[in-house]
Amino acid sequence: MEVLRVELPLAPVERLLRKAGASRVSEDAKVELAKAIEEYAMQIGKKAAELAKHAGRKTVKVDDIKLALREL
């Protein structure tokens, strides 16, 4: 059996799926969605960090996140 590692806790991922209408959620489904969320968050974070650096800052601000979301 493959060991699946994700950074996000799976309980909130399951809650999101249930809120979206799922009555039951497999462990694999939780892990797969968590991996997708992490990947998207990394893309946003990298873009936001680039924007902060371009602005001459080391600190990522909320406006960097908002702009990164619009650009992705």
From Swiss-Prot:
From the Swiss-Prot or TrEMBL record, state where the protein is found: Cytoplasm; Chromosome
One example GO MF annotation = protein heterodimerization activity
Principal cellular location given in the protein's record: cytoplasm
The alphabetized UniProt keywords are:
Chromosome, Cytoplasm, DNA-binding
Annotated CDD domains: HFD_archaea_histone-like
* Keyword check for ATP-binding: no
Q: Which Gene Ontology terms of cellular component type are present?
A: chromosome; cytoplasm
Q: Which domain of life is it from?
A: Archaea
Q: Where is this region: Interaction with DNA?
A: 24-26, 58-61
Q: Which Pfam families would you find in this protein's record? A: CBFD_NFYB_HMF
Which InterPro entries does this entry report, sorted A to Z? Archaeal_histone_HMF (IPR050947), CBFA_NFYB_domain (IPR003958), Histone-fold (IPR009072), HmfB-like (IPR050004)
Q: How does this protein assemble?
A: Homodimer or heterodimer with another histone. Dimers then assemble into higher oligomers, with the DNA wrapped around the protein core.
Q: Which family does it belong to?
A: Belongs to the archaeal histone HMF family.
* Function, in words: Binds and compact DNA (95 to 150 base pairs) to form nucleosome-like structures that contain positive DNA supercoils. Increases the resistance of DNA to thermal denaturation (in vitro).
Task: Report what the protein is called.
Answer: Probable archaeal histone A1-1
